[in-house]
Amino acid sequence: GSQRNGIDGAHILTPMPDLISSGAMTANNVQVPMYILARLNLAGQCISVGNEYKDLKVGVDASQFRTAIAAKRASGKPVNAAMTFPGGTHDMWIRYWLAAGGIDPTRDISTIVVPPPQMVANMKVGSMDTFCVCEPWNRQLINQGIGYTANTTGELWHNHPEKAFAMRADYVDANPNATQALIKAVMEAQMFCEDPANREEVARICAKRRWINAPFEDIVDRMRGDFDYGTGRVVENSPQQMRYWKDQASYPFQSHDLWFLTENIRWGYLPKDFDMKAWVGKVNREDLWRQAAKDLGVAASDIPASTSRGLETFFDGKVFDPENPMAYLDSLAIKTVRG
């Protein structure tokens, strides 16, 4: 934390607070208790592929991609899929997509970690065949003529949870008033970003060197909800655009944390006997979100009555029931579950 010249909180991939709190993704498996205080957005990520596969016009169906990469591997060439952090959201999206297309992400392709700003450069030199990342890197890939968008992640799971606002538990416990002020500030920012009239201004802010440090032109279209896939397919005001406040985007449903942990079990990052519900109960502080929302004057109708968003249906027909995560896990054909 800040007492040791570190940080107390962050904009973070949704499952990471659980993985850090449990020690699953920390050095020497040291547990660092954290709290999820809000969700920051829904959807808005993309899976891109290189121009090597341009003729395939790969989309949500990865079956043709499966055939192409199998042939490439058979010729002795490496095949790589890049994401931003093991067990994180981008890792989960690209693994889900690959597996749904019959590609085993642990056997049929190498999964590598690449920081978001380095994705395009690595694709350009042929270090990877596909990647999953946030914007503006997918759009930048198209603008530089290096690849195209296969799908937006909302096409895999409509209005899926993505980033979270999380803080160290010791800071929150010691500073309840400051924590509430921070949550309310985040909520107000989410409301501002949700308004279409503000999207261009937000894009200009994000383009600055101190933030994303990328051309405005690479950011603005998709922030407005307009998606040019780089294949001739163009969708304006996409239903899969990123949401910041609408559709209860800010609320940290515990059911969503359960899905991410179930997927981490699916891919062997967590053991099958990992007590998901216990950890979610420790890490998810929806109670603090509710308090901040009420203090901010958020309408009661905009404050979810349940900790669960209910059944979640994916593009391949799979259904996740937060009341029975193991049934969902058992239904998945491709997985790497450890004891």
Where are these regions (language model features)?
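A bilobed periplasmic-binding-protein/Venus flytrap-type ligand-binding module shared by bacterial periplasmic
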Residues: 44-57, 160-177, 192
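Short, glycine-/small- and polar/acidic-enriched structural segments
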Residues: 1-106, 110-112, 125-139, 146-159, ...
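Short gly/pro-enriched beta-turn/loop segments at secondary-structure junctions
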Residues: 159-160, 201
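Conserved C-terminal helix/tail region of periplasmic/extracytoplasmic solute-binding proteins
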Residues: 258-339
